[in-house]
Design a protein with these regions (language model features):
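C-terminal motif of bacterial Sec signal peptides marking the signal peptidase cleavage site
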Residues: 26-30
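Protease-domain processing segments flanking chymotrypsin-fold serine proteases, especially trypsin-like
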Residues: 33-186
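Conserved catalytic-core segment of clan PA serine endopeptidases
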Residues: 149-159, 165-168, 180-183, 200, ...
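Cytochrome P450 catalytic-core helices
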Residues: 194
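Chymotrypsin/trypsin-fold serine protease catalytic domain
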Residues: 264-342
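Catalytic nucleophile loop of clan PA
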Residues: 347-371
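C-terminal cap/linker of serine protease catalytic domains
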Residues: 369, 378-405
Length: 405
């Protein structure tokens, strides 16, 4: 079973799972050999985009936007005419205290299941050395792998991973997400990777609201019944971080649906976040780590073992704990024109959506190659998109908007 150890100066920890080993540094550059990275993190020049950028976003909206009315509850009006949908049309004013322990506990998982009838397996598909040759192929269904609880405290064993909270027309919802590196802000990233369906409704709607990220949620692994009355710092040890910018793939926006596999090949998103109560430090400096994303991963035959993480919330889980699964992924193709998806045995359920798929690269370091997207009603496997140039464009777009470049 994999864990993500907290990294301290001059200490190299390992993520061990089956044949998989990697360093998930909690300091910004320790995996790159900078052993003094935690000797005294300096505040980033811009830990948040601030009021000026919010006003710029508001000024560019296609209708008049009343911030005070929004914060007083107008955000709960999901009228189609004011439900922002397009890339760049996103506002998310911080509402202090909205995501308290009680409301976090009420958040439901967004169902993203797929019917077996949508999957056409090829029992004899040959392996490929080129990712392009993986397109259009679906390997036999993976054997279920029982998810295992990640050791606590999560600040030591999984700090870059947390929960993504948001409001949809159905009420408060929850997914999972991961702190990832910002190419334009090395060591000071405020970026989080998650699934597209955790930020945008796809073809039937627009951007979700009150998007926030809580890294190392429920740090000490309290039971679900204990969380509501627990100390806030036990539930959100690094605080609540509100999205100030977000983007997903155009493929998800144009094709994504609430259930089934439509749009799943592009089910990826990046959030830029800022702390509800500003600390002057970036998210990466605060939690101590950010992961690389590999947008040019090998063909499935060369991936090796992968570890899937998330906070499953649907039965038999309750969303309180972080879990992981380790498996060797196969190929899944719903749209043969798109890069292949990966699927792997895993019993995690809804709520794990957006959680990372990690593999060990040739430098013996962890990298994110996908995020949890869809699974069957029986919860025996999970699938995630191969991250390609369109996904890279999502990261680059958000990075350029918030960090320059």
């Amino acid at each position: 079973m994999s864990s993500i150890p907290r990294q301290r100066p001059r200490r190299r920890a390992a993520l061990a799972a089956t044949a998989m080993a990697a360093c998930l540094a909690l300091t910004a550059t320790a995996c790159n050999g900078d052993e003094d990275a935690d000797a005294g993190a300096q505040p980033s020049e811009e830990a948040s985009t601030g009021d000026d950028q919010l006003q710029d976003l508001i000024d560019n909206l296609p209708f008049e936007f009343d911030v005070e009315a929004w914060m007083d509850g107008a955000w709960a009006d999901w009228d189609e005419e004011t439900w922002l949908r397009e890339v760049g049309d996103f506002v998310n004013p911080i509402i202090d205290g909205l995501w308290d322990q009680e409301r976090m506990g009420e958040a439901e998982d967004p169902e993203q299941s797929i019917d077996d009838d949508q999957i056409d397996e090829d029992q004899n598909a040959p392996e490929a050395d080129d990712p392009m040759a993986d397109r259009g192929i679906t390997d036999p269904e993976p054997v279920a792998v029982e998810a295992e609880a990640v050791p606590t405290p999560y600040t030591e064993n999984g700090a870059p991973i947390g929960k993504v909270f948001f409001d949809s027309p159905e009420g408060p919802m929850v997914c999972s997400g991961t702190v990832v590196k910002d190419p334009n802000a090395p060591g000071q990233s405020n970026l989080v990777a998650t699934a597209g369906h955790c930020v945008h409704a796809g073809t039937g709607g627009g951007w979700y609201r009150n998007l926030s990220f809580v890294p190392a949620y429920n740090n000490n692994g309290l039971g679900a019944a204990e969380i509501e009355s627990a100390a806030y710092e036990d539930v959100a040890p690094y605080g609540v971080w509100w999205a100030d910018y977000v983007s997903t793939t155009q493929y998800w926006i144009d094709n994504g649906t609430e259930s089934g596999g439509d749009g799943a090949h592009g089910d990826f998103a990046i959030l830029s976040v800022a702390p509800e109560n500003g600390s002057g430090l970036s998210l990466e400096e605060t939690v101590g780590a950010a992961l690389d994303i590999n947008f040019d991963a090998p063909a499935v035959s060369g991936l090796g073992a992968v570890t899937l993480y998330g906070f499953p919330a649907a039965d038999p889980y309750d969303g309180a704990l972080m879990y992981s699964c380790v498996d060797y992924p196969g190929r899944l193709s719903i749209d043969a024109t798109m890069p292949v998806m990966y699927w792997a045995g895993c019993t995690m359920t809804g709520g794990a959506s957006g959680g990372p798929w990690l593999r060990t690269n040739e430098n013996d370091e962890p990298e994110l190659i996908s995020v949890n997207s869809i699974g069957p009603l029986e919860s025996t496997w999970l699938a995630g998109p191969r991250l390609d140039e369109e996904a890279r464009g999502v990261l680059d777009y958000v990075s350029a908007e918030v960090s320059g470049g």
